[in-house]
Amino acid sequence: MTDSSGVARWPTVPVTFAGIVLTLLAAAQLDGLQLNGDLYGLLGDDDPAVMTFRDLAKVTTGLEELLVVCDPDQHMPRDDIRRIESLPEIRAHTRTYIHPGKSSLYAFSLTGDAADYRHAGIVVKQVAPILSAMTSTCGMAGTPAYIVETHDNLNRDLITALVVALVLVTLLFAFVYRIGWLAFAMFIPVALGIEWGLAAYSLVRPELTLFAAAVPTLLIGIGIDHCIHMIQACRYSIVRDGLSRDDAVLSAWWRLLRPITVASLTTVATFCALAASELRGFADLGIAGAFVSTGVYVACITLLPAILLACPERWLSGKAAFDMPLRALAGWIEKSGRSIAVAAIAITAIATYAAGNLDVLSDIRKLESTDIQSRILQTRIAEEYGLSASPILIRFDDSDDAIEFMADIDRPESVANLFDVTDIKGLVQVHPVANPFIRSNFEAVTWDLERQIERLELGAWTLSGAPALNARIDELLFADIRFVLPLAAGLILLVLAFGTHSIGLPFVVLLPLVLSLIWVAGAMSMTGVPASVVTAAIIPLVLGIGVDGGVHLSAAWHRHNGDLTAVFAETGLAIVVTIATSIAAFGAFIVATSPSLVQFGAQAAGALLGCLIVTLLLLPVILRHRLTAEASRGQ
């Protein structure tokens, strides 16, 4: 079949065959991909702070122990202690704390890495039935139990969010276009593209860290954007131009190839900027996002036309909701352009002032779930025995230095207690008075410790522990923000300049998105929501994803010579639905139990909602002003 313009028939058979082969290869490659739910996995095993902690763990039996905690005045039978101690993954029963009126504590060191989910998971699964068969009420705490529980909760949250995103996107599309089956058809290239991208990612990284694990859910909303624009363009060609289904599909493909490619490249560019981060969590998010975005793009431009050509024509020619209201909106925008611009400037000024007082969350533990049983038990132990749940660790090369350090009577006021670790020479636990996971508190206590060590003229020492890892994440976070944001913006501008063949238009398209981010920062400040590592992750994502609507709007603006009614008739509904699906994909994380995922979803959804508003209302005003200015210069 050849259309009136001489466009050749779509190669459905070879494209479908290639897709099947690639899908089978990807499925085989994905078999070894693991999920890493450890929050400190955001640093990566090659980070100096992690390497120090791991090296300390190798020479320190029981540094990361499995703790069995029994209710006050309840004890663990000696036979059950021996049963746990005899497990192949348990190295030794290292210590026991039993005090009247307090919880009984039994510590077991592991033969492998206690922070490795695969090893810790085996241990926890073996110990769980032993504890459930006891008459005493006991539970597990410590690093192994926490890692397993966090991992399982994360896995459950991601599956739940994925299902919710699928349902929301399907319902949204079915409601707007009134054809549910077409929504399911759209998911085929998106799902295959996600699989291809994850398979490519697994060739580079063996595991998905906390942020990278959210990519499949995000790309449902992002990837389906291409499908929606293609379907809307087909509807426009059938209804307005009178083309047949086959001609409409091929015409839409050629007409949208450039804007879809540019929009995809802006998303890939954003993820590439994140991939350059020093923080492993951001880098993994960037690598996974770049691969998956590319996979979804390739699947959509190759497989989607074949799917649409197989659909009944009535699926593409029916009426859609909100078509007429959007066309009416175009007339209102034309009349109210100055008022819209004034309102945008006023909102931006207020938001900028409020954003100047935005707090930053330095206690990364507040991004973790508080209802995790292992963490509850760990906190109870700390309160009952007067110990910090996560002390700072100091390892002196000379064990005599550790003895002198602990014997010093002029202890800093920021330090509550000092304890040595049984049978580990030179290792001291520092229990601060204030929460060491808050940046200012950690810096204060470490400064006091350094002054104390200098005053005593002690030898070489190493600082480690969970608070030190938290401080390292904090340090890299602020460094990456200053680097990633300008890089992402620069790459997006380059892509837009290449795709639009203009130098000024990319700044016009990107400006409303910057305003949207300022509005969100101002809203967070006014509502008391602090910025965090999560906020830093969504900013470049919103720039790369939110710009897609502006790309399609500016392309349609050029095709229709600034006729806003015609622009909205062709692509206005698609812009609304695509950004709405992205909002639904991010918003699906709000149902998660993990505060980090909830914040990730809520903040990104709010920013994209701002993108939708400025793209529909403000961007046409800016484009109209730019067109008028160019006409004036021409005269």
Segments predicted by a language model, with ranges:
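Short, surface-exposed recognition loops or helix-turn segments adjacent to catalytic cores
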Residues: 57-58, 96, 140-143
